[in-house]
Structures are given as C-alpha cells and as structure tokens.
C-alpha cells in the first residue's frame, strides 16, 4: 500500500488540504482495480536491494551514490530492467545508468533557466515516471505532485522513491480529469507533452488554470508547427506514427489560445527541433523510436510527410 499520510501532512494548512485528505481513499480504490502487469512490476520493485544514498544530486542530473558492490549492482540492474521500457530520464542509480529513450535532461536544461521554483507547490500533469518531478525538487520546489494514469510510470516512480522516501514528491496514478474542479492550490503547473493528445486543447488550458493559485504560472510544452497565428495542423490520421495527435499549433497560435484561456504575460521561452540523439531506442527502451517515425530520406518530415517534431515551451500567468 502507498501511504499518503506524508502528503496530507505536507499540504495541511494549504488550499489543497481538503483534497489531500481524500486522496488515500481515491488511490486505494484505483489500486484495487489494478492492472494486468502490476504484479510483475511489483515483483521487480520487491527485488530492489536495500541501499542508502550517501550522495544525492537532483540539481545537475538524477544521481544517487553509495557504496555498492558488483553483486548488489547486478541485482539492482536486473530489477530496474524488469520495469522496462524506460521512456524519460536518464537516471544514475548507484552506478546503474538507466539510458532512457528520451534525454529528458536536455529538455530540462532548456526549460529550467526560465523558471523560479523555489518554495513553490508544483503540479506536473502527465508526469510520466516522475523524472522531472525530481529535477523540480532539485530546482528548489517545496513539493511536487505528479499525475499520470500509466501504471508502469507509477511503478518506475516508486522505484526511485524507494531510495528517496523523505523527499516531498508524490506520483498519483490519476488523469487530470480525476482532480476536482477549481483546486486553485498550486503555484506552478506543468503540462509537457500532453496538449497534442487532447481533443479539446482550450478545455485543457482552462483545466490547468483551475489548478493554479492567483498569480500562479503555467509551463506549457507541446509540439508546434511553423507559421503565423492562423496556422494549426490537424493530422488526417497519424502523426509520427502516433494515432492520438489532434492539434499542433504554431507558436503564435498557441500564445493566442493561452491568452483566450485567460493567461497573461504569455511568452515563448524555447523552440527546438527534436533530434534522433534526444529520442532514440536503447537497451532500456527496445521499441521503435524517433528515427523510425521520420522520413528516412528527409528528416525534416515525418513518415507521413508532415513537419518533423518541433517543441515549444510557453509560459503564462493566471491573473
């Protein structure tokens, strides 16, 4: 059982206290329904060796260090491989380097210089396995709650939390829709890699705004296309082999959407093309990756002939 009592204590006296008090029952109900692979992933978690970090770095990377002999490291590596595929990272766990599909540290190095997370209560929507949550703590956040309904990501987070039990980061296997309306309790809300999966992007922006305190900041990272304020791509079918991609706006169009949703001080802080060095297959993620989704003769296009992935980070404030 996951004990959320520390989370309840952390949020006592905040606008999120009432919500926090009901989370244990909500989580227990969700876990009772389970998932077909949960037992296998739980076995991998149970196989993790008992280790105590002597040095923790969440500022420049995710690195845990301690005295660890070769035999223990082999057990650790096997257990962590049992939680494959690993999408977001990398993680260096007592000398075991989890070489994830994404170099998420590169994205964080593009995003983090534009933010001040010191002392902030943070919500990460679509948090994946929680890599960014740990880095947010490294950047000074007071607490970080991630929501993502994917059970494997939940278990991968538990693996890291096993070695960092006292840090104020929590992963809830919920969708944004499972959160109550008008929470208005977070100083900063992240939505990275989610918007293009939403059939109604404006509703997504409004739901994110509802999670923020007045004056709170939204960090929106999503796929974009070149063009002016009128340019929005809606794929006929797939985009980079993904079925569930709906709206890819230009940066000016996305900025307009955010203003229409009620955000102020809207600005783009980064635009970057995703490369096959940043997203690729590895031993820890053996399935197809970006190189399989691009036109083999022209990497400026996807296999469908659409513009290759380009990502923007837009920040805005709730007035």
Swiss-Prot record:
* Binding site residues for carboxy-S-adenosyl-L-methionine: 88, 102, 107, 126, 176-177, 192, 196, 311
Top class in the EC scheme? transferase
- Reply yes or no: does the keyword tRNA processing apply: yes
What's this protein's function? Catalyzes carboxymethyl transfer from carboxy-S-adenosyl-L-methionine (Cx-SAM) to 5-hydroxyuridine (ho5U) to form 5-carboxymethoxyuridine (cmo5U) at position 34 in tRNAs.
Q: Which NCBIfam families match?
A: PRK15068.1, tRNA 5-methoxyuridine(34)/uridine 5-oxyacetic acid(34) synthase CmoB
Which HAMAP family does the record cross-reference, listed alphabetically? tRNA_carboxymethyltr_CmoB (MF_01590)
Name it: tRNA U34 carboxymethyltransferase
Protein source organism: Pseudomonas syringae pv. syringae (strain B728a)
What's the source species' lineage?
Bacteria, Pseudomonadati, Pseudomonadota, Gammaproteobacteria, Pseudomonadales
Give the gene that encodes this protein. cmoB
